[in-house]
Amino acid sequence: PERSDGEDMLELFQNVAHKMDLKTAVERGVLVPIRCIRVKTNIDLTDVRINGIKYNSQDLESKLFIPERNQLIVDTYLKYVNGKKTVIFCASVDHAAEIAKLLRDNGVNAEAVSGRDRVEIREKVLKDYETGSTDVLCACDLLNEGWDSPHTTVLFMARPTMSKTIYMQQLGRGTRRCPGKDDLLVIDFVDNANMFNMPYSLHRVLNIAKYQPMAYVLAPENKRKLDQDMLFKGEKPEAWLDVPIDVDDYEIIDLFNWQNSVKDMISQIEL
């Protein structure tokens, strides 16, 4: 597993008995297939300062903590996945608290969780999510690693990051299997950026250029083929039936990544 602190797991364990990447694990059925919806915002990140490959936290929060973007997150939940077990990754602790409040104002059982919370409060929030009394968890960095819930079926990537490691850690919070869970839906919030401060998205992190709303991004070959056959006929796969999306929509994504050109000059901790 990739770690944000840059620690090399081989230093601890020396020998690797078995190694499997995300793509292989999904294709072999170890992890659930992954679908994606990209939601474009009108937020401009081009003048957000960066340090290595980290956004300046104050710049980022000032860009993202605005009513219009927050409402877009809430509206997206209500429109596409209302009632589904969802984790929303937010830009800051205050941002997470605001999104949770807006969701509650719209009748959604949502809570924010952060490292600022007392241990007993944090444990109760996580337990309520596990037992079903809470449908949505809004978090900043607390849930990036060391926690997951197999019941999570939707991830909102509402916190831009230029770190592939952080994005993959967040993605891992929803990929585990459990009874009744057919796949994971990732909703990427796509803000405007230039080629040198562009955040990761599911397609960019997996180096997949073609995007079609709700289509499989990763899946076993037989499931992917079944979906594509239905799309070719102009029909919606069963998983799409309740989602108001036009099956003809598609997009080619710019996969340029300047980090690949300078990776030898940037520490693994930053990547």
Residue ranges and their predicted role:
Residues 1-37:
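Post-DEXD/H (motif II) to motif III coupling segment of the RecA-like Helicase ATP-binding lobe
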Residues 19-32, 50, 176-233:
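A conserved SF2-helicase RecA2
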Residues 29, 137-155, 171-176:
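SF2 helicase motor core recognition
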Residues 41-58:
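Short, basic/glycine-rich phosphate-binding loops at helix/coil junctions
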Residues 61-106:
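Conserved strand-helix element at the start of the C-terminal RecA-like helicase core
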Residues 78-79, 85, 196-271:
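Long, largely alpha-helical accessory region at the distal end of helicase-like NTP-driven motors
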Residues 87, 96-104, 108-144:
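Conserved helicase ATPase core of P-loop NTP-dependent helicases/translocases
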Residues 162-182:
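Conserved SF2 helicase motif VI
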